[in-house]
A protein has these predicted regions:
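Short beta-strand->alpha-helix junction loop in the catalytic core
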Residues: 18-20, 29-44, 91-92
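Conserved donor-binding/catalytic core segment of Leloir-type glycosyltransferases
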Residues: 45-73, 85-87
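Glycosyltransferase donor-sugar binding loop
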Residues: 84-100, 118
Length: 227
């Protein structure tokens, strides 16, 4: 029994979200600690020419993949001289094949869309984030009720302003500085992306402050110090 108790002293439990923390505490009476996502940091500057809009991750319905063609058309109709796109298409289900084909057709029409089809390594992911200036988080609101998204943390550590769904309250709580804008629909996404472009130095300064704040948080994270 003493050996068992000694072993448990050296086992630590962590969770990534407050919702998970509260559920574990409710069902087990264990008060676990929170662990912050640990990613690679990079610096951003104001681009010389076009602003790169980045959409990375899995191409699922609940992550808003179906919204992409309309967003691209909308933005290109208003600011084609100011924007270009990096779009990753990954794990797209069969019922969204039409959306995938539509994005390829748009890339042939507009010439300002770079498509990365399939899985990318972490190194490739980091390199793409270094190129991206603005991220639209197109997820369905239900997906963001009790947890964030790796893309949100990626925006923080890479000093990237982000447009998030309106009323994504959990995501908003992750930010100390308002390097994000909320959008209620696709027209709002386009309008706010253009708003960020036209005020980029302001949003970039906030993104840099947010990145530093998150870096400091990681430096004091107890799990980081144990690894």
């Amino acid at each position: 029994l003493n050996k068992k108790n000694e072993l448990f002293k050296n086992i630590f439990f962590y969770t990534e979200t407050d919702f998970q923390k509260q559920q574990i505490k409710k069902n087990t009476a264990i008060d676990v600690e929170m662990f912050s996502n640990n990613l690679t940091f990079s610096k951003k500057e104001i681009p010389d020419k076009k602003f790169t809009i980045g959409i990375l991750g899995e191409s699922r319905f609940d992550k808003g993949f179906y919204k992409l063609p309309d967003l691209i058309r909308n933005l290109n109709s208003k600011a084609i001289d100011k924007v270009q796109f990096i779009v990753q298409i990954n794990n797209s289900p069969k019922n969204l094949l039409g959306i995938k084909n539509e994005i390829y057709a748009l890339s042939r029409e507009f010439k300002n869309i770079e498509i990365i089809d399939g899985y990318i390594s972490f190194f490739e992911y980091r390199k793409l984030l270094e190129k991206i200036n603005i991220i639209p988080l197109l997820h369905e609101l239900d997906q963001l009720k009790n947890c964030g998204s790796g893309i949100v943390f990626a925006s923080m550590v890479n000093e990237i302003p982000i447009v998030i769904p309106k009323d994504a309250l959990y995501v908003k709580k992750l930010f100390e500085f308002e390097s994000f804008v909320e959008a209620k629909d696709l027209n709002d996404y386009s309008k706010n992306i253009i708003h960020i472009i036209e005020n980029f130095s302001f949003f970039l300064e906030l993104a840099k402050k947010q990145s530093l704040s998150y870096k400091n948080k990681l430096n004091f994270d107890p799990l980081n110090n144990r690894i």
